[in-house]
Amino acid sequence: MKKLALTDFLKYRYPSALELSPDGRYLAFALKETDREGDGYRWNLWLCDLESGESRQITRGDAQRQAVWEDDTHVLYKTTELDEALRTRGLEEEWTVYRRLDVRTGEESEAFCLPMSVTGIWRMDPGRYIFTAETHLDRPNLLELAGEAREGEIARRLRTRGYKVLTELPLCENGVGMYNQTRNTLFLYLEATGEYRRLTPDDYDVNHVNVRPGQVLFTAFPFRDVKPVTEGMYRWDADRDETVTLIPPDKYSIDYVGYLGRKALCLGLVMRDYGVYEHPTFFVVDKEGEEDLGRYDRRVNSEVVTDCFSGSTTGQRMVGETLYFLNTDGVGSCLCAWERETGVQPLFGGDDYLIDFDTKDGKTFLFSAAVGLKLPEVYRWSGGELEQLTSFNGDVLEGVTLSAPERLTFTDSDGVDIDGFVMKPVGYEPGKRYPGILHIHGGPKMVFGPGFHHEMQLWAASGYFVYYCNPRGSCGKGNAFADLQG
């Protein structure tokens, strides 16, 4: 047996962005790997045939993070290309190119390209797509300009490239950087003509999007200067070319929107009792207003802290009129189902970290999950035992001695139970003294669990006791436990 090494994390691989084909035969997902020589990461799409259980890589461009199913056998994936004419003049403007891939044969071709940085795309119906893309209030899109207008804007950018004028709050975001005057804008694209057009006003920053044939539900923050914590809920109808406001933008922060028959479902944070990190209330919404179905006292996302996962996730899926979602409960994650008549019912889970999931029928579920002290893999669950479908990290920890976290729950001074964990040093000898490290998670609204955590395992392998807990302010025990308002 051997000890965990610092650089072992360079071997870890992370599956995410799970998307089932419409017929449920195939699962497409992204796999992230470390590129040590390039000082970065590689992302490629993989396909799991759920009949044979075999998985194979289907892209090799090292920058493909999401598959969009067009039908049972074809996916779209995006690549980005810098405009060569502008690059030679010292400016970087990005085209988004979508390629169409037959997952059976591997045959692929360019489907279409868009002159902007696309952040998400959804197939509405044959030949029509809804997409979101970055737009800017303080400058036009160079790729849409020509002639004197284009030359004038190029000159202005070259003249002012040494500084930024910041006029909005917040100024920046973790993992994004400065995004002053930037908006996420909703568009319609018509493949037959190559035309696209904006569906939201200039100052709308679009958040959640849910698409069905001929209609789009979305939420957005309309703002200038200071971004609010509340957002509006809207429905755009293709036949009428009309946008209806379902919830005004000054009422709720919103965790999810989806279709519920002819109405809509909204998970809104009222923020009356516990502020901006309050757990959501279920609302059924139509143009007449909202029906309050009660607050759910857990987070409707999986918020387990780990340093061994990266990628996009989907925490909610609607099948018919049942909403399936991942929550954070205790020190782990649960798959839950919500129906209007019965409310929330837990289906599967416990102390493991359920990261991402998809389902087409509400009977078979595909997960990216970290089970026990394993690294993330893809699993299938149909009501019985969890079935592991991939072994991307099977050899990485083979022969490595790990420290199993021991759960210790104690009661604090005002009678509230606090969940904690202790990891003994690898090779621990009773009676011998060891140094210790107390690890405190950030947040707010996060939670430590008993799963694999590279940094803490490395400390244990280096001869330290490691102890950590989920104090007040953590997720998994309801609003009152998580409340940090002074």
For each of these PLM feature ranges, what is it?
Residues 4-10, 54-58, 107-112, 195-200, ...:
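A short beta-strand motif characteristic of beta-propeller blades
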Residues 44-50, 97-104, 185-190, 231-239, ...:
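Beta-propeller blade signature
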Residues 356-363, 368-486:
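Serine-hydrolase catalytic core recognition
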